[in-house]
Structure formats: structure tokens, C-alpha cells
Regions:
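Alpha/beta enzyme core
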Residues: 5-22
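Shared catalytic-loop signature of beta/alpha-barrel
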Residues: 13, 19, 27-49, 53-158
């Protein structure tokens, strides 16, 4: 986020006129504490989402306890894996906070997030479709578009959970070797 608190509030009021569902991390993140976000949340006309850079369940619990966000966004690649995202989503659910796992980057992270969404305790996030929300980067990215064979496919705005073993994808070992350090 790059907004000041005042500008974030102005933007949120503007976006509300277009029926936006939430606003994600509008202010700079200076630490896992997300200073100022609990104050911002109290003034927001839209649900406030954040927590994509959380590195532990303890950091997530602190934000949930502070009510810093309406929607917590743990990322499996940063917070300790799929099991930690499920744990954090259970903590959130117990506190009345929604959980939309964050997902940005490579095929492997996308596959892990899709599998995790199938595990979260309550898929009814209050969206009109009652389906989990998957954040899916569409920018050009060789790590997302070639690292795995059998990519996660989007059809009519939906993703099916792969049924193959593991994450449901096969890693392209040649590409991994190409980028190995």
C-alpha cells in the first residue's frame, strides 16, 4: 500500500460507490504488526483485508486479536505452509474474521493455495457465490507459467482442485535447473 490513512479512507469511500467487496493493505506495511491498521479499520466504509506478509501464526493471532483486519490474508509460502494457513483460518473463524489466503507468484504456490482453500474450515466467506476467493496474479511470470506441468486452469472464473497426488501438479525439473543458483 502507498496511501496515507486519510487517502486510504478517501479511496475506500470512492471504491464503495462501485460495490467493491474490500480494500487490501492500502497503507505501507512497516512490520508484521501493521501499525495503524486497527485504527483505519474502525473508520473504513469497506472491509479491510491484509496480512499477506505474515510469517507466523503468532503474528496472525496478534492481528486477529487486535481486529486490525476484517479479512486476514496469510500466504502459504511465507507463514509456514498450508497447515499454518488452515490453522490461521481457524483462529480467524473463531473470532469472526474472514480468511482469504494470499497467493502471488509461482505455479507451486498457486497449487498449494488451491489445495489449502479446499481445507479451510468455512468456505462461506459471505460472497454472493459462497465460494472461496483465490487471488490469482495474471502478470507475465515464467515461474507461474512454466514451473509446473499441468497448471491450475481457470474456467469461467472458477478453479477445480486437482485430484492428482500431492499438490496436483508436476514440477518441470529442467526449468528448476535452469534457474538454480
Amino acid at each position: 500500500g502507498a496511501y496515507t490513512m486519510a487517502n486510504a479512507l478517501k479511496m475506500a469511500h470512492y471504491l464503495r460507490t462501485f460495490d467493491f467487496e474490500f480494500l487490501e493493505e492500502p497503507m505501507p506495511q512497516r512490520s508484521n504488526n501493521y501499525p495503524g491498521y486497527d485504527v483505519l479499520r474502525e473508520k473504513m466504509p469497506l472491509p479491510l483485508a491484509g496480512g499477506e506478509a505474515l510469517d507466523s501464526r503468532a503474528a496472525a493471532k496478534a492481528l486477529i486479536d487486535r481486529r486490525a483486519f476484517d479479512i486476514i490474508q496469510p500466504d502459504a509460502s511465507l507463514c509456514g505452509g498450508m497447515g499454518e494457513v488452515v490453522f490461521i483460518s481457524e483462529l480467524a473463524q473463531l473470532s469472526g474474521v474472514r480468511c482469504y489466503p494470499h497467493c502471488w507468484g509461482a505455479d507451486i504456490v498457486i497449487a498449494a493455495t488451491v489445495q489449502t482453500l479446499a481445507l479451510v474450515p468455512d468456505p462461506h466467506f459471505g460472497l454472493p457465490t459462497d465460494t472461496p476467493f483465490l487471488e490469482l496474479d495474471q502478470s507475465e511470470n515464467p515461474w507461474r507459467e512454466g514451473l509446473a506441468k499441468g497448471q491450475i486452469e481457470v474456467q469461467d472464473g472458477f478453479v477445480r482442485v486437482p485430484r492428482k497426488p500431492g499438490l496436483g501438479i508436476t514440477v518441470d525439473e529442467e526449468l528448476v535447473q535452469k534457474y538454480a543458483v
